Design a protein with these regions (language model features):
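Pepsin/retropepsin-fold aspartyl endopeptidases
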Residues: 1-235
């Protein structure tokens, strides 16, 4: 979406339910006078793992007809180096206390303190502890998946993958993957996985396996995987 920070010109923001806070780059923070207050620890996909970042406050954030004041934010300072693109801005509606509906087919985004219930083909119980998760199964084993509108694929953690038994053995295909904490040198593609979310099935599905130990440690529970655009864009 396009958003204005402190009344400045519009910039692109990723709507990111996989982020604990709204995030701005060092460049935008300096340009729009978002002052850092203190440092905190953040964690994401990538070999950096736990990462020290600044916390600041956006006086006003405008997205379409929505205007929010006094928005806590993470400032990506120091910035990551060695990744293909610069770190982008992202807006976390859940951290702002908002409900959100993303209609991928109609390309429509709805925010609100309360959003009326609508008929649904499938409902998944949602849990929120810093991030929002749903329960799923990986080869019939229970796992918690982060709902990440800012992510691209369906992935599972390396710890979850290590508990799966394969007969015969399945070849692992190395991948080049980076996230909010840099490159993940151990990422690989694992074919032949059976995923289930209530009645939503992904049989014999290739998943990306990521090192999620740092996010799990910071959150205080084992993150089993992440569901991103590949999953969510069907709805």
């Amino acid at each position: 979406v396009r958003a204005k920070v402190n009344g400045g010109r519009e910039v692109d923001f990723v709507v990111d339910t996989g982020a604990e806070q709204t995030v701005v780059s060092r460049e935008i923070a300096r340009r729009q006078n978002v002052q850092p207050v203190v440092y905190t620890l953040s964690a994401g996909v990538g070999e950096v793992g736990l990462r020290g970042l600044q916390i600041g406050r956006i006086d006003s954030l405008e997205i379409g007809s929505l205007e929010i004041e006094n928005v806590p934010c993470l400032i990506k300072n120091p910035p990551l180096t060695g990744i293909p693109t610069r770190e982008v801005e992202s807006f976390s509606p859940l951290a702002a206390g908002l409900s959100v509906t993303v209609d991928y087919e109609r390309r429509r985004l709805t925010f609100g303190r309360r959003i009326a219930d609508a008929p649904a083909d499938v409902e998944l119980p949602l849990r929120q502890h810093r991030l929002v998760t749903v329960r799923g199964t990986v080869n019939d084993q229970d796992a918690s998946f982060v709902v990440d509108t800012g992510g691209e694929v369906i992935s599972i953690s390396s710890q979850t993958a290590s508990t799966l038994n394969y007969r015969p053995l399945v070849r692992r295909l190395p991948l080049r993957v980076y996230g909010s904490s840099g490159w993940d040198p151990d990422a690989f593609l694992l074919p032949g996985v059976n995923l289930m979310f209530n009645s939503i099935a992904f049989p014999n599905y290739p998943v990306v396996v990521l090192n999620l130990r740092a996010p799990s440690a910071l959150l205080g529970f084992q993150v089993g995987g992440i569901i991103g655009h590949t999953f969510l864009s069907r709805y």
